[in-house]
């Protein structure tokens, strides 16, 4: 399954409780903090709630093979 890199780009000041909880569930704590999550329906739902606070891009699967 593919993965997504999610980066918080805006502050939670003034954000609603549901948006703050969604960021916390994703594992984001501060601006410019990034996490890698599986691309599934649950993750996409959380991203939809906070789409104005985050940037989403495909995760790079780097490493030596």
Swiss-Prot record:
The gene is rpmD. GO terms for molecular function: structural constituent of ribosome. GO terms for cellular component: cytosolic large ribosomal subunit. Belongs to the universal ribosomal protein uL30 family. CDD domains: Ribosomal_L30 (cd01658). It comes from Mycobacterium tuberculosis (strain ATCC 25177 / H37Ra). GO terms for biological process: translation. Pfam families: Ribosomal_L30. Part of the 50S ribosomal subunit. Keywords: Ribonucleoprotein, Ribosomal protein. This is Large ribosomal subunit protein uL30. It comes from the Bacteria.
């Amino acid at each position: 399954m593919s993965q997504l890199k999610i980066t918080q780009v805006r502050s939670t000041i003034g954000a609603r409780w549901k948006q703050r909880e969604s960021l916390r569930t994703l594992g984001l704590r501060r601006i410019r903090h990034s996490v890698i999550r599986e691309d599934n329906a649950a993750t996409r739902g959380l991203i939809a709630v906070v789409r104005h606070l985050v940037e989403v891009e495909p995760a790079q699967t780097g490493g030596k093979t």
